[in-house]
């Protein structure tokens, strides 16, 4: 049986440079990522952390690939007890310009069969990337109620 993989594709009216900034600048990520600030120097081999609004680090991993403004890849896993037996998975962002649009493809892979983390990111990524698209195109992120994501406790 093959390991699960999550792929999400969207088209955003922006430039590759603005989208790259939106994916890598912690001040910007907290505007569309449920208040989370991504923290890294974005060099291959460097640490990656997701810092919540209360200052706690909820997710951590390593930067794997950096090719601005075309490709970004990092591993990460959620640090909560719920996911303590899970391995870090690889998230890869590919940015392809098409005129006034950028095609953003996110592939998140490396999950074990039955992964609870895979189940969680499958609900989270569509909301995060929809809010990112809205913010870049309209200047306002979406206000998606956490309950709409239907995460299990």
Predicted region positions:
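Intrinsic-disorder/low-complexity, polar/charged segments enriched in Ser/Thr/Lys/Arg/Asp/Glu/Gln
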Residues: 3-9, 47, 58, 71, ...
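Hydrophobic/aromatic beta-strand elements that line small-molecule binding cavities or substrate pockets
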Residues: 10, 60-65, 89-96
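Short, highly charged C-terminal tails/helix-capping segments
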Residues: 134-153
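A short, structured loop/turn motif at beta-sheet edges
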Residues: 16-17, 64-70, 94-103
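Short beta-strand segments that buttress and anchor functional surface loops
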Residues: 47-53, 74-79, 108
